[in-house]
Regions:
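Low-complexity, Gly/Ser/Thr/Pro-rich intrinsically disordered linker/tail segments
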Residues: 133-143
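Catalytic glycan-binding domains that act on GlcNAc-containing polysaccharides
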Residues: 1-135
């Protein structure tokens, strides 16, 4: 959830800003990222191929959340801690190859963003566990 917040602010149609031609005319976008997860075209296609979810849409919240889980699970199998949202986000942004090369070290702004993602992730986790206790209570409903 903290990745979605950071990448798209929970907006289904989020896209990167356009570059400007002659400082005024809207031009091409900086990347092919689209939707809640801001997944790039090639990575999204890999996800659809590997999961068999050929009808997945980056503008669908469920599909985007599943994509982020799929991508993070690749990190888990490479030794990432599942609760280390900071490192997972850096790998999400830079790619696992870029993370291994530590390309993020040349981007202090990205490290700050990853720290915010970790903080938000911890907050969301605490909120979830608070709600989980309430949801597990047995209730009787009368119709």
């Amino acid at each position: 959830m903290s990745f979605v917040y950071q990448e798209s602010s929970f907006k289904a149609d989020a896209k990167p800003e356009r570059t400007k031609l002659l400082w005024v005319i809207p031009w091409k976008r900086k990347s092919t990222a689209v939707g809640y997860s801001q997944a790039l075209n090639m990575t999204w296609e890999d996800y659809k191929d590997e999961t068999g979810n050929s009808g997945a849409s980056r503008k669908n919240f469920k599909d985007s959340a599943d994509f982020i889980g799929w991508y993070a699970s690749k990190g888990y199998y490479q030794g990432f801690d599942r609760l280390d949202a900071r490192s997972l986000y850096l790998a999400y942004h830079e790619g696992y190859g870029g993370f291994k090369k530590k390309t993020y070290r040349k981007k202090p702004w990205l490290i700050k963003v990853a720290d915010r993602v970790q903080t938000r992730s911890t907050k969301y986790q605490q909120q979830y566990w608070g709600c989980a206790k309430e949801l597990k209570k047995k209730r009787f409903f009368f119709f």
